[in-house]
Amino acid sequence: MVMPLAVINAGACVNEGAIINTAAVVEHDCIIGAYAHICPRVALAGNVTVGERVQVGIGSCVIQGLSIGANSIVGAGSVVVKNIAADVVAFGNPAQECRNLV
């Protein structure tokens, strides 16, 4: 589902059940996993891979070419400057993994 004012650029792939919320930007060649939630005003630079069932919190930014592993949560307002593992909570500027979800 793509909400109003969201931007999805060329070559991006949004899989089944994913939500691209209001005013989010998904740049070229990003891959958004099934059932992921890209919250309002998130900016994903080019070639970002977001795993299945990931939530990227409101106003977060993800630097080009990075990956966020399946089932992870990125806190609101975070700046992701390195890959995020699967099944973790990460937040901050720069985003740091702070706890496991399993």
Language-model-derived ranges and their functions:
Residues N100-V102:
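Short hydrophobic/aromatic patches at helix-to-coil boundaries
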Residues M1-F91, A95-C98:
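Structural signal for interior beta-strand "rungs" in well-ordered beta-sheet cores
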